[in-house]
């Protein structure tokens, strides 16, 4: 499909630079294809679902994956270099995006304070592979000491990261470190809202997908067939898969909290829609025409024009439905992107394609 089909005009004033306070106070647009749009709030979510539905949360935790350092070569002046870690390949090894990547070659040493890495490989689009001088928990501690929180560029380009972001940019249930971007739909959920979900008879389950920096990358291809997704590591354990299968068999709906949870569930889905345990990388790229097998509803934020995430929601609820929903959201003053408002999406009879 042509990528320009997923373009739309978004005023700069629609971009949220801070989250709602408290975090469950954001607005929520309910989108049911073929029905009128409904303006609600995130706190209304328990009433918008029904007892027996199962919400699936991504419990990944954001690490301070942005490292600023210096390239060192014998006899050459140091070159300031920024890297964004995005995929761990071994206890001592990470894939990363570097700036300026064009000045790096295999064998270069990078120093980040007390931490040193060697460039093992230089790939396309600014991607490199780094081998660090320590591994495992020792490397994790060094990254935590030297790294910075990787706020999305559309926020970081407008203001500096500060102490508030250390809390605001983590979900309250984050427990498995490894993401370099937050699963932002989950940022809306407070402990009080989670308790309200429980009281309403809704199930809560957790999966893990370590969100990579590829989520920030623009789609540069003119056609979706020309875009490659970067791999992200995910885990759906057997007990959770069994519980979700049982919930659906009993008439409950599977509600993915965020596109990351949805992508993992669809990666783990069998042809009949049941879930199998999953552990490993996924590069699933969902565009209109995709047939969803495992997910019945989706809680998600409002996404960038021409992004893979807007393509995903267009596949889920229909491209024209989402065009209309986003036009309504912009006109009604909804806040967009990571710190913005939420939507609750339901699928149409089948996703539409131009």
Curated annotation (Swiss-Prot):
Q: From the record, give the transmembrane residue ranges.
A: none
Record carries keyword Cytoplasm? yes
Pfam families attached to this UniProt entry? Queuosine_synth (PF02547)
For this protein, the Enzyme Commission number is: 2.4.99.17
The pathway this protein participates in, as annotated, is: tRNA modification; tRNA-queuosine biosynthesis
Top-level taxon of the source organism:
Bacteria
Alphabetically sorted, this entry's keywords are:
Cytoplasm, Queuosine biosynthesis, S-adenosyl-L-methionine, Transferase
- Keyword S-adenosyl-L-methionine appears in the UniProt entry: yes
Which GO annotations describe the biological process of this protein?
Answer: queuosine biosynthetic process; tRNA wobble guanine modification
An example Gene Ontology CC term for this record: cytoplasm
EC category: transferase
* InterPro entries the record matches: QueA, QueA_dom1, QueA_dom2, QueA_sf
Q: Tell me which Gene3D superfamilies the record gives.
A: QueA-like
Q: What subcellular compartments does it reside in?
A: Cytoplasm
Q: Which reaction does it catalyse?
A: 7-aminomethyl-7-carbaguanosine(34) in tRNA + S-adenosyl-L-methionine = epoxyqueuosine(34) in tRNA + adenine + L-methionine + 2 H(+)
Q: Coiled coil where?
A: none
What functional role does this protein have? Transfers and isomerizes the ribose moiety from AdoMet to the 7-aminomethyl group of 7-deazaguanine (preQ1-tRNA) to give epoxyqueuosine (oQ-tRNA).
**HAMAP family attached to this UniProt entry:** QueA
Family per UniProt? Belongs to the QueA family.
Please state what the protein is called: S-adenosylmethionine:tRNA ribosyltransferase-isomerase
Q: Which gene encodes it?
A: queA
């Amino acid at each position: 499909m042509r990528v320009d089909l997923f373009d739309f005009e978004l005023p700069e004033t629609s971009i949220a630079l801070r989250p709602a306070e408290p975090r469950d106070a954001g607005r929520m647009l309910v989108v049911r294809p073929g029905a009128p749009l409904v303006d609600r709030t995130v706190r209304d979510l328990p009433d918008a679902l029904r007892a027996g539905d199962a919400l699936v949360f991504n419990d990944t935790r954001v690490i301070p994956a942005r490292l600023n350092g210096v390239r060192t070569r014998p006899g050459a002046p140091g070159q300031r270099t920024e890297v964004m870690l995005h995929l761990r390949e071994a206890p001592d090894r990470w894939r990363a995006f570097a700036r300026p990547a064009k000045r790096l070659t295999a064998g270069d040493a990078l120093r980040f304070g007390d931490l040193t890495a060697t460039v093992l490989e230089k790939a396309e689009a600014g991607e490199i592979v780094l081998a660090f001088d320590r591994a495992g928990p020792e490397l994790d501690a060094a990254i935590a000491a030297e790294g910075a929180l990787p706020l999305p560029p559309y926020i970081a380009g407008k203001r500096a990261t500060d102490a508030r972001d250390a809390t605001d940019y983590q979900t309250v249930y984050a427990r498995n470190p490894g993401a370099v971007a937050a699963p932002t739909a989950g940022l809306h959920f407070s402990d009080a809202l989670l308790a309200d979900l429980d009281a309403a008879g809704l199930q809560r389950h957790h999966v893990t997908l370590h969100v990579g920096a590829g989520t920030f990358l623009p789609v540069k291809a003119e056609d979706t067939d020309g875009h490659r997704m970067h791999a992200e590591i995910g885990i759906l354990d057997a007990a959770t898969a069994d519980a979700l299968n049982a919930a659906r068999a009993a008439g409950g709906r599977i509600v993915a909290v965020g596109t990351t949870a949805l992508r993992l569930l669809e990666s783990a889905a069998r042809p009949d829609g049941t879930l199998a345990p999953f552990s490993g990388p996924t590069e699933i790229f969902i565009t209109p025409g995709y047939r969803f097998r495992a997910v019945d509803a989706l809680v998600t934020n409002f996404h960038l024009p021409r992004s893979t995430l807007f393509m995903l929601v267009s596949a889920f609820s229909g491209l024209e439905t989402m065009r209309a929903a986003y036009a309504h959201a912009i006109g009604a003053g909804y806040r967009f992107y990571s710190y913005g408002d939420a939507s609750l999406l339901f699928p149409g009879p089948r996703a539409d394609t131009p």
